[in-house]
A protein has these predicted regions:
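Secretory targeting signals
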Residues: 1-9, 20
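Flexible, surface-exposed loop/linker segments and immediately adjacent secondary-structure boundaries
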Residues: 14-25, 29-65, 72, 80-230
Length: 230
């Protein structure tokens, strides 16, 4: 194989994430987290203000299924629940729903309900759902980013496979298979039957980054598929 002195895309992204301080200061020190086992630590970054069940968040706060997570204006919270890592931006309201088959105290997530705000989420859970005021999204082990408002949801399948359906129109549904931010969508709360979901081009100013996805996956001992060499 011919040698190339220019770093390939995966290596370049990793270097950018490290230089930006997104990785090493956040990755759990315990070997169990790096080996992909669940860690008991929840909060890895807190910028500004956040609350869990109405209580202020600090670096020792534990977040688990059944919790209600909110963030203040201009804030950002990076946290892990089991094998699921999330980045929640400011002015967000998120409910973490437990898995139906799990016992009390389990960290396995059954679903996420984003009432408002902006969420980046990485998970290998299959059969999980994310709900917003206008969309129901079936997750099959993916990285996703979404912004939930009262009238529409912005949704990007960063990688993986999802089933998307409009809450107010069962005929508006779509399966998206994405390798790398291939098909962002708007899902509306109102519209013509069968036309509540609209593909959109990539935004001129990205609202989430590969470095953030790399960071989130690293927190649970994984790497995104787009960083893996073919």
């Amino acid at each position: 194989m011919k040698e190339n002195s220019t770093p390939d895309l995966p290596r370049r992204l990793l270097l950018q994430a490290i230089s930006a301080g997104l990785l090493w200061s956040l990755i759990p020190a315990s070997s169990s987290a790096l080996e992909g086992e669940a860690t008991t630590k929840s909060v890895f970054r807190l910028k500004g203000r956040a609350w869990v069940n109405g209580n202020p968040v600090d670096m020792n706060t534990l977040i688990k299924p059944n919790d209600i997570v909110k963030t203040g204006h201009g804030s950002e919270l990076v946290f892990v629940v089991g094998h699921h890592a999330m980045l929640l931006r400011g002015r967000s309201h998120l409910v973490i729903e437990p898995h139906e088959s799990e016992s009390v105290g389990s960290l396995l997530i059954g679903g996420l309900r984003l009432f408002a705000g902006k969420l980046l989420s990485v998970s290998r859970n299959k059969g999980m759902r994310i709900n917003t005021p206008s969309a129901t999204i079936g997750i099959r082990g993916t990285g996703v980013y979404l912004e939930a408002g009262p009238e529409r949801t912005y949704f990007c399948t960063c990688y993986g496979e999802v089933d998307v359906q409009a809450v107010n129109d069962p005929d508006s549904k779509e399966t998206v298979v994405s390798a790398h931010h291939d098909k962002p969508l708007y899902i509306y709360g109102k519209g013509q039957p069968g036309q509540f979901i609209h593909p959109i081009p990539r935004l001129p100013v990205p609202n989430h980054s590969d470095e953030e996805l790399i960071m989130a996956e690293a927190l649970v001992g994984r790497v995104p598929p787009f960083t893996e060499k073919s």
